[in-house]
């Protein structure tokens, strides 16, 4: 997992690995929310950035007569650009205003752009997905294949608040996660303890209530996968591929 820092934390209702919490109990856990992402962004100290993302169904993308099917959609807030250190070949990523308002803009992976626009520039064009039109404002640099065959070359990114307009906040075909990047050099255990307490406080949990969420450390997950596979390359499936872990 190369493009996300090892210190990155994923907060959601699922655990990356084995847990002592029984399955029936885990199934009762609520999803993390956009409000909780905002709470963490505002009140969690020593945080470089936090991003809210929504795992949404893959779909077809069309431009005039050209189309690409089964495209993975990264529905994220604007901070994700810096958290994953995405690289733009043309144009730009969406900004805070576009992220907050859910503007229908889109960033295309390299292969998606080349398939939809083989002989013309993609920027400024309107593509269609989920029955909506999105303006292309950026194209990612070519990345190559990832560990599980996934790659941002065959993915696109849209503002998560646009995805929320389409799917709502309680759609069973989606699940959300909060991606948190601590500042460098901080005490990791202390940070996680503070983050845990902040989320418990936001949820109004009592002292004897168990955590109804999981704080997943990317480093621990990476170590497990590295033991199985050796070197890892890329994490284009972080947003769209968690179904491998929970489904």
Where are these regions (language model features)?
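Short, conserved clusters of charged catalytic residues that mark active-site
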Residues: 31-35, 108, 119-121, 220, ...
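Peri-transmembrane interface segments
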Residues: 1, 179, 188, 192, ...
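Mid-to-C-terminal secondary-structure elements
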Residues: 74, 78-94, 103-208
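Glycine-centered tight turns that cap/initiate beta-strands
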Residues: 45-49, 121, 244
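Hydrophobic, regular-secondary-structure patches
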Residues: 1-72, 79-82, 115, 186, ...
């Amino acid at each position: 997992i190369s493009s996300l820092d090892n210190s990155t934390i994923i907060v959601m209702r699922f655990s990356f690995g084995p847990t002592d919490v029984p399955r029936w109990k885990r199934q009762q856990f609520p999803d993390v929310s956009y409000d909780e992402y905002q709470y963490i962004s505002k009140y969690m100290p020593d945080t470089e950035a936090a991003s809210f993302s929504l795992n949404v169904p893959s779909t077809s993308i069309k431009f005039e007569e050209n189309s690409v099917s089964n495209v993975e959609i990264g529905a994220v807030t604007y901070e994700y650009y810096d958290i994953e250190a995405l690289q733009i070949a043309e144009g730009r990523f969406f900004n805070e205003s576009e992220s907050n308002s859910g503007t229908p803009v889109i960033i295309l992976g390299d292969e998606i752009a080349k398939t939809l626009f083989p002989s013309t520039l993609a920027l400024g064009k309107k593509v269609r997905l989920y029955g909506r039109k999105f303006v292309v404002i950026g194209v990612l640099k070519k990345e190559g294949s990832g560990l599980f065959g996934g790659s941002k070359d065959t993915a696109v990114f849209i503002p998560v608040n646009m995805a929320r307009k389409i799917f709502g906040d309680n759609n069973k075909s989606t699940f959300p996660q909060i991606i948190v990047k601590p500042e460098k050099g901080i005490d990791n255990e202390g940070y996680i303890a503070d983050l845990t307490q902040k989320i418990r406080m936001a949820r109004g949990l009592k002292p004897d209530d168990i955590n109804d969420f999981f704080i997943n450390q990317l480093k621990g997950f990476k170590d497990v996968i590295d033991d199985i596979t050796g070197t890892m390359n890329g994490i284009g499936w972080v947003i769209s591929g968690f179904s491998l872990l929970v489904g």
